[in-house]
Amino acid sequence: MAEENRKDRGVSSTVAIPSGLNRIKTRLASSGPRPEDSSDTVLKPPFNRNQKTIVPRGHGRTTGSSKQERKGTKLSRWLASYKPKYSCHPPKYACSSTTSSEEIKLRGKNSGKDEEKMIKISETNPPCSKSMGIKSFSHELGPRGGVQTPYPRPHSYNDLKELLGSLHSRFDVAKETVDKKLDVFVRDVKEAMEKMDPSCPEDREMAEQLLDVARACMEMTSAQLRATCESIVQDLTRKRKQCQAGLVKWLFSQLLFILTHCTRVVMFQKETEPIDESSFRKFKECLERIPALETDWGSTPRVDDSGSGYPEYQRNEAGQKFKRRDKESLESETALDYVVPNDHGNNAAREGYAAAKQEFPSHEPQFDSKVVEQRFYLSDEYEDKMSNEPGKELGGSDYVICRICEEEVPLFHLEPHSYICAYADKCEINCVDVDERLLKLEEILEQIIDSRSLNSFTQAGGLENSVLRKSGVASEGCSPKINEWRNKGLEGMFEDLHEMDTAFIDESYTYPIHLKSHVGAKFCHHATSSSTGSITSVSSTNTPRTSHFDSYWLERHCPEQEDLRLMMDLSDIARCGASTDFSKEGSCDYIMACMQDIQAVLKQGKLKALVIDTFGGRIEKLLCEKYLHARELTADKSSVGNIKESEDVLEHASATPQLLLKDRISIDDFEIIKPISRGAFGKVFLARKRTTGDFFAIKVLKKLDMIRKNDIERILQERNILITVRYPFLVRFFYSFTCRDNLYLVMEYLNGGDLYSLLQKVGCLDEEIARIYIAELVLALEYLHSLKIVHRDLKPDNLLIAYNGHIKLTDFGLSKIGLINNTIDLSGHESDVSPRTNSHHFQKNQEEERIRHSAVGTPDYLAPEILLGTEHGYAADWWSAGIVLFELLTGIPPFTASRPEKIFDNILNGKMPWPDVPGEMSYEAQDLINRLLVHEPEKRLGANGAAEVKSHPFFQGVDWENLALQKAAFVPQPESINDTSYFVSRFSESSCSDTETGNNSGSNPDSGDEVGIWKLHPFLSRYSICNHRIYRKLFFLLLCVF
């Protein structure tokens, strides 16, 4: 009995399901012998329309039963060799199968003559087999690796002709595959026609029409089939609906399944512009907007500057100087009262800017010695002032790392600096050009000055008039609403700002904290989670609103400590630097004078890490970048005499909070720890940022895959939208960057697994728990659709469980890549393992084949319009939501089967194995699923918006406004910070080695590789095992009956 319990998917092992799951129901599939798996799979047409057949989960919901598998540790599963998803040649149309006499006898009770005909048709297919390829994990991250695809693939996206040839050849390869399948289909139809009953001439006539269509498609060229395949599929779909259940309708489904391979390719290519040299150049321009740095997988945290684009002499001359820190600026010195600069110095800056604007047009500025001399004069005056200043006031020695600028900040300035830095970062988040970023910083400085002036926070009598005069420069649309300022306090300030916590930061990165505020309290415990349920520190991207900043500035900031005139000087310098055209003569000298001015302003600042220091450092960094660019593009001989002085300026600029050469993030800034999961279109790795110690999840995608799909512009457009938003049920994006071959997306790290992993263990969920999960999914889809984004690839794998137990939807910006893999390659993922003498080994190998190909070949969650290759919209997501709800309640998708073409036929027929209603499912849940799974998209629930879904009786009692604040039924309890054992990937199940590895310390040798990661309450464990046995017996009984 104990051995039997261990075989039942390892449910006897400890697992981590909370006691909040009141009624645990388990999945209907098991790893034991089944009547269906005792022999080869034989496809048969559906004859009884009301037949309810519960099919075992055929794509990865099962674990191995061997004893060696149970001894592997969590980490060894990933370090061991695994089988890649494309480790074999494209399979043929079908594989041979030998049906046992007992099974045929049982099926004969409920089948007619048509069934025997279809069995003989299936037996005509030749046998085939696949080799189980092995690929080392060490090649996962490299630019090379993977298995060759059946179509020509370019070696680099820079080779335009080779790339375009690869793009155009995709449909040609699809045509060749379809022709082979059509040839087999024609032979099968001929054999079926010979045995048809002569008393049914209608069936014979329809079969002849199918023969004519198949032959015509085979005779067409690739161009002709591309132009006519959509109309052919639409006509076949219409005729199929008119057929009655039987052999002819099954033949219609088979032909549709073959031809939709072409229509899906056409659909994805039609949604974008034709692939030619012009569109490819547009793509390259779009891709170049993402910063590209060469990848270096070494352990050194140094950034590889080989791809910076600057000449060698400039990197040696200036680049190395930016890596040295001015430690004197971090030392604590005695503070004296600040002497306000006289009006002459302040007016000099404005006169210099006015002279440049008046004498030379702004769109084509030029510079002469007077303007440059004016800038140097201002710098000399600042230097004279600084000679009488002892230094900056730091007031303490404790420092912490800001999660935004990643620089050390005095502890007592952490709260205001975090807000100011986030606000400054907002100025540059959507700006690419240096001049645009300078103008944005200048605009925000003007708003700060306006808020100070309008509330009488001035230090000079005539300052207010000058500020009011300048206020017209700022953008009117970005001006704050004065009436809202006083209505918002400190809590309102942080409404849109990330919490300043160091959730799950390594101890080596934490600092002693003595701050007695809300922010300081968060820092005191390094394992405090964020309010969003993420382990990733969430203080690095979200930024406050304009009115929030002014409210905080007026109510919380100490105005006497920040000099208003220095802010005005920073604004002038940023404006002058942005108006400089470095293609004109004298631009280098002028920018260098601006850099000297800003360095003088920074030296006069009394407080570190506040407005002057934060904005000034960012402006200085941008000016340095512009200066180096100007030196690269211009050969101004007049600047040769100032080389020594410019070197001093560049060397001093290295003390700014932002280093110039480190402005753009790359993969070298992260330490790759281990893989988390593998998906249909990318791999996800757990990584730690070297500077802060924060954990992130990095998704790695191949550039060529995106180019091959010809959908890069939409992907980048969705990414640009989602990277700036924050929603409690969507996974956050933090960074995106590229190397030569890959695109990297850095997302928040959620170590609670996903709904697929949860269902993998518990089988199915109570309706109350499923209602909350689906309600959160509805809100996520509602938000995505408001951004004009269709997910298209919704499934339990993409619903991650956050640290607080709530779900977060992922892959929404890149789901179309996975969708293409899921739909185009459906027909190539068939179980074609040759029969073995040992039925147990054959059943195990057959199951492994289905698991290995499931993630890229299952159409379980796809809407009919996507499978048929027709136009689709938001309604496709609501279809998938209905599939997910059915799976949460029953444990299996409604249309699942052992082969993709059978799933395809089930979806078109709408045949579902409903559980007992209302015993196992309520009437409200059944009605919601029925209305979501309507074949016509315009009639589907949700076609007119999410409001009609939210108003369904199934969601009665759901508090939509406070759903994210409710306590979740299942809250993950990871063993450590970097514990990824809650993830059970569809790929990882077939990728792990069957042999025990040597690294198994700290784990139970008797626990299964997936099962041992959950900790289940003893009562729930016993209940789950008992329930599992009941469902397994019921499952076998249903198989025998039907």
From Swiss-Prot:
| Keyword set includes Zinc-finger | yes
Where the record annotates domain AGC-kinase C-terminal, the positions are 956-1042
Q: Which gene encodes it?
A: IRE4
Entry similarity comment? Belongs to the protein kinase superfamily. AGC Ser/Thr protein kinase family.
Q: What is this protein called?
A: Probable serine/threonine protein kinase IRE4
Could you tell me which residue ranges the Protein kinase domain spans? 670-955
ZnF C2H2-type: positions: 402-421
Taxonomic path = Eukaryota, Viridiplantae, Streptophyta, Embryophyta, Tracheophyta
Tell me, what's a Pfam family for it?
Pkinase
* InterPro entries hit by this protein: Kinase-like_dom_sf, Prot_kinase_dom, Ser/Thr_kinase_AS, Ser_Thr_kinase_AGC
Residues where Phosphoserine is found = S854
